[in-house]
Amino acid sequence: MAAKQVIFGDDARAKIVNGVNILANAVKVTLGPKGRNVVLERSFGSPTVTKDGVSVAKEIELSDKLENMGAQLVKEVASKTNDNAGDGTTTATVLAQAIVREGFKYVAAGFNPTDLKRGIDKAVAEIVNEIKAIAKPTTTSKEIAQVGSISANSDADIGQIIADAMDKVGKEGVITVEDGSGLQNELDVVEGMQFDRGYLSPYFINNPERQIALLENPFVLLYDKKISNIRDLLPTLEQVAKAGRPLLIIAEDVEGEALATLVVNNIRGILKAVAVKAPGFGDRRKAMLEDIAILTGGTVIAEEVGLSLEKVTLENLGQAKRVEIGKENTTIIDGAGSENNIKVRIDQIKKQIEDATSDYDREKLQERVAKLAGGVAVIKVGAATETEMKEKKARVEDALHATRAAVEEGIVPGGGVALLRARSSIKELKGDNPDQDAGIKIVLRAIEEPLRQIVANAGDEPSVVVNKVLEGTGNYGYNASNGTYGDLVELGVLDPAKVTRSALQNAASVASLILTTDALVAELPKEEAAPAMPDAGGMGGMGF
């Protein structure tokens, strides 16, 4: 085991504060509408230009192992806030730096770090409750657009396109972000439920222009095994043919004689039927078939529920207004399932999302919710160069997370004002002893810091602006994009309550740990061995 260096007390604190400051100073220049860019080196290709706090934080690794510990702890603040709320990473970093800075002043003056931590925790809990109390729900598309714009560094186009996407697919719908091919941002919306399986034979195509099979008002047969024998299918086909409607068959596979018969019937116009493979694999396939059954008001034909293909009646089949089947995708539009059953299914999947342990499972479950809820929107980000595309795409993703957070827990006035207004809830707060009171004072000062940094980045005097904002009440604050004061909610300067709350909680959590640290242990730097002397051989011809 390599030898370690151990340092204590003031020396340890000085090192950790240096690390915190290096990382926080690099991140905080990006805060606010007039925040600056940070350029990140890449091992290959062009450098990345970003205004995203967590992207900057993730790149920082310091050569001094002791200072690096401080930097990594603050990096954790940004990452955790990003995971919880999807935005607010720079605010969280600024708050953590302020709590560490103010806290160490008290530690140096002889206050007990553990009691300081308890005071900080007490104050933060009160402020979080106050933020929840002043938050108001997002009701209009305009508010969603404003939240998105602020998060995307005051880019109104991005805010608007996200609001449009949410209008189209609903607040539960899936919105994905992809690289566009032009200079402008574009929005593509897929209505209904789409899954990534297409027709099993090109002979099913009945719309040559779009190269799709289009079924109007079809029945939907859902089967969890392979179909290869046409005899199994005949009872169903006869009933559907009598009803004079088309049929969509979704099964593990349709092959051989069964597929050939369907194709021949389709070409001859006897029965319009299209076969596709069921989406997913294993247990996920069963779950998705069940989703489609609930959406279309049908039943999955499976031995487990005592149903076989020969015994299928029209009551067992699902129905939809329209189905479009392409080479790679199938879209079911306006299924005949009951609203109540769909809602119950969505709630059930949401419960599974809460219990999911892996990001992959969570993502797949969220996709299923969106497909049941009614659609998927794709935002295609346009830009002139690849570097600009990456930067813009990161901002769109941030804005998307922020708008989701706003829908979840509501909105508060932005520009650091919500935290300032929440001060009133802890002004009279008392701890169990003077050291805890000092912890409360640390938070009182630290929550001014986001506004101070926004103002500093905009080139104004922080103390003057903070005092002027404190003279006002309610939503009165400073709009850094044009240097004016007014009602920030009316001006459209909004933050999601969840982002503000998460930023403070995560900052206080890590900063408190740093304050109560009194020793650092790290590997000693390896001493570089002196380079070997070059070989002196082959020096003949010297005349000795």
Curated annotation (Swiss-Prot):
Pfam families: Cpn60_TCP1. GO terms for molecular function: ATP binding; ATP-dependent protein folding chaperone; isomerase activity; unfolded protein binding. Coiled coil: none annotated. It is found in: Cytoplasm. Keywords: ATP-binding, Chaperone, Cytoplasm, Isomerase, Nucleotide-binding. One of its GO terms (cellular component) is cytoplasm. PROSITE patterns: CHAPERONINS_CPN60. GO terms for biological process: protein refolding. Its EC number is 5.6.1.7. The keyword Heme does not apply. Its main location: cytoplasm. Gene3D superfamilies: GroEL, GroEL-like equatorial domain, TCP-1-like chaperonin intermediate domain. SUPFAM superfamilies: GroEL apical domain-like, GroEL equatorial domain-like, GroEL-intermediate domain like. It catalyses: ATP + H2O + a folded polypeptide = ADP + phosphate + an unfolded polypeptide. ATP binds at T30, L31, G32, P33, K51, D87, G88, T89, T90, T91, G415, D495. Transmembrane segments: none annotated. Together with its co-chaperonin GroES, plays an essential role in assisting protein folding. The GroEL-GroES system forms a nano-cage that allows encapsulation of the non-native substrate proteins and provides a physical environment optimized to promote and accelerate protein folding. PANTHER family: 60 KDA HEAT SHOCK PROTEIN, MITOCHONDRIAL. Forms a cylinder of 14 subunits composed of two heptameric rings stacked back-to-back. Interacts with the co-chaperonin GroES. Belongs to the chaperonin (HSP60) family. This is Chaperonin GroEL. It comes from Methylobacillus flagellatus (strain ATCC 51484 / DSM 6875 / VKM B-1610 / KT).
